[in-house]
C-alpha cells in the first residue's frame, strides 16, 4: 500500500507498507515528513486501518498529525476495518473522499485483497524453459538454462513476495540458497523459504538448512519421524506437518496454515512435479 501527503500543492511525505508487521504506509509517510503536517491532505491507496494489530491504528496517527483531508483509492475489505476507518476519521472532523480510483488500486494491491478475502497466500508460479519446451538439459541440469537478465528478474521477484517455495528435489539437485540478491532494489528482502519435503529428505548440510538461523526456513512434510523432525528444528528450521495427499504434502492444508502465519504471498520456484501438484489445487490456492 502506498501513501502520499500534500500541503500547499507540495508533496511533503511519501510512504508505503513494506511487509506484514512493519509500519503501515500512513505512519511511514508521516515519519518522513520534515515539516508541519497540520492541515495537509493525504492520498492513500487503501482505507486507513482503525484497529490494533501488529501496528497501532493509522486513523489515530492521522488525527494526531492534524491531517484535514483524506483521499482514499479503495475501501479495505478486512472486516476489522471495512468502513470503520472512514467513520472514525469523519467523527474526528477529517474530510474523506472515497474510492476515487478503485479498480486501479485493486490491481495495485492484488496480493493484499486476495489474502484478506481468502485467508491464504497469493501464489505465483515461476518456471524457466528452453525454446523447445524443456525445463532442463538432457543430463538433468536446470540451473543455468536462463540468461543473466532472467536471473536478475527472479531475484527482484523474490524481493516482492513474502515467501519462496520449492520441492525437496530442487534442494537435493541444486543446493540453492533461495535468498534475494537483486541489484535492482535497495535493501533487498529475503523471503521465508518453504521446502515441500514429504519424507524429510532435505540434506542437513544443505545451504538452506545451514543458513536457517539467518533466513526463516519452513520444511513442510507429512512425515511423522519425530527424530528427523528434531534435527531440522535444532538447525533453526520450522517443521509443518500436514496430512498426506497421494503420498505428498497436502498443499491445500499447507496454504491454510501459511495464511494463518501471516504469509500473504508465495513465489513457487520448482521443477515439474511441485508445479503439477500446485496446478491441480490452483482453484483452492
Q: How should each PLM-predicted stretch be described?
A:
Residues 1-5, 274-281:
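Conserved small/polar residues in nucleotide/adenosyl-binding loops
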Residues 3-8, 127:
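Short beta-strand scaffold segments in enzyme catalytic cores
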Residues 7-104, 192, 218, 223-225:
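Zn2+-dependent cytidine deaminase-like catalytic core
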Residues 22, 86, 100-128:
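Proteins enriched for Cys/Gly/acidic motifs involved in redox and nucleic-acid/cofactor modification
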Residues 114-115, 124-131, 135-264, 273:
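Active-site ligand-binding patch in enzyme domains
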Residues 268:
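Gly/Thr-rich phosphate-binding loop signature of adenosyl cofactor/nucleotide-binding cores
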Residues 283-285:
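N-terminal low-complexity segments that are often proline-rich with Ser/Thr-Pro
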Amino acid at each position: 500500500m502506498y501513501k502520499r501527503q500534500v500541503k500547499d500543492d507540495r508533496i511533503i511525505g511519501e510512504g508505503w507498507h513494506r511487509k506484514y508487521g512493519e509500519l503501515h504506509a500512513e505512519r511511514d509517510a508521516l515519519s518522513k515528513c520534515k515539516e508541519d503536517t497540520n492541515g495537509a491532505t493525504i492520498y492513500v491507496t487503501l482505507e486507513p486501518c482503525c484497529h490494533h494489530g501488529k501496528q497501532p491504528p493509522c486513523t489515530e496517527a492521522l488525527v494526531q498529525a492534524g491531517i484535514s483531508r483524506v483521499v482514499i483509492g479503495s475501501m479495505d475489505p478486512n472486516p476489522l476495518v471495512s468502513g470503520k476507518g472512514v467513520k472514525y476519521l469523519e467523527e474526528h472532523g477529517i474530510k474523506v473522499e472515497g474510492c476515487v480510483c478503485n479498480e486501479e488500486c485493486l490491481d495495485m494491491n492484488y496480493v493484499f485483497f486476495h489474502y484478506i478475502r481468502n485467508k491464504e497466500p497469493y501464489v505465483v508460479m515461476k518456471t524457466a524453459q528452453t525454446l523447445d519446451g524443456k525445463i532442463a538439459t538432457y543430463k538433468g541440469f536446470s540451473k543455468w538454462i536462463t540468461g543473466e537478465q532472467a536471473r536478475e528478474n527472479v531475484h527482484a521477484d523474490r524481493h516482492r513476495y513474502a515467501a519462496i517455495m520449492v520441492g525437496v528435489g530442487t534442494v537435493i539437485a541444486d543446493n540453492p540458497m533461495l535468498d534475494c540478491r537483486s541489484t535492482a532494489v535497495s535493501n533487498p528482502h529475503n523471503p521465508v523459504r518453504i521446502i515441500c519435503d514429504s519424507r524429510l529428505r532435505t540434506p542437513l548440510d544443505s545451504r538452506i538448512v545451514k543458513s536457517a538461523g539467518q533466513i526463516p526456513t519452513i520444511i513442510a512434510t507429512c512425515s511423522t519421524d519425530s527424530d528427523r523432525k528434531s534435527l531440522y528444528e535444532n538447525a533453526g528450521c520450522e517443521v509443518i506437518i500436514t496430512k498426506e495427499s497421494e503420498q505428498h504434502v497436502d498443499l491445500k492444508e499447507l496454504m491454510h496454515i501459511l495464511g494463518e502465519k501471516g504469509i500473504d504471498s508465495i513465489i513457487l520456484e520448482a521443477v515439474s512435479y511441485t508445479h503439477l501438484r500446485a496446478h491441480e489445487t490452483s482453484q483452492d490456492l
